[in-house]
Amino acid sequence: SVGRTQEIVFTLDKLKGQGKIGEIPVFVDSPLAVNATEVFKLHPECYDNEMHEYLRKEGDPFGFNSLHYVSELEQSKELNEMDSPAIIISASGMAQAGRVKHHIFHNIENQNCTIMMVGYCADGTLGEKLIKKPSQIKIFGELLNVNARIETLSSMSAHADHFEIIDFLSNQNKEKLKSIFLVHGELKRQERLKNGLIENGFNHIEIPILEQEFKL
């Protein structure tokens, strides 16, 4: 909802400007994403040079004509009754909860639909199961046939990846970094990042376990 949705909307606006997407409606169906987008629009001083140049030439990428923001639950339910082409951007990204789960439930058996998973999905989540492209999947206790096309787009994560984290830390004074704590992500990925940091000259890297205490 925060970061990734806005990047997707910005990308769609650019694709529309290039004539690669027609005038089909785009719905952002997530109250948090709607509110977060308003925050983005209120703070242009945080935009980079590319974004300022785009605003000058093309206008607001978060407000093009066919873009609609959905906050109310009843409006969200109405989207499931549509039979014309549309793009629905919804959360959560891993499809484990939220409105997106209902959209998948209502459209996964439709061979004319495409479900695109954007970004990382943790093991065991509905999103991770969909990425494996099963022939059937259980949602809300009901076994459904997967007739929709399943696609993935891994380049749009709101989180810094392995190399971006190392690059960020490489700009810090290593002598002043007394300890680095890795507290987010799967253990195997944390261990891989820890090894990458060690290879780049960082020391005292900890992967805390639940209730473990450290003296700082």
Predicted feature locations:
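Acidic/His-rich, metal-assisted hydrolase cores and their charged scaffolds
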Residues: 2-216
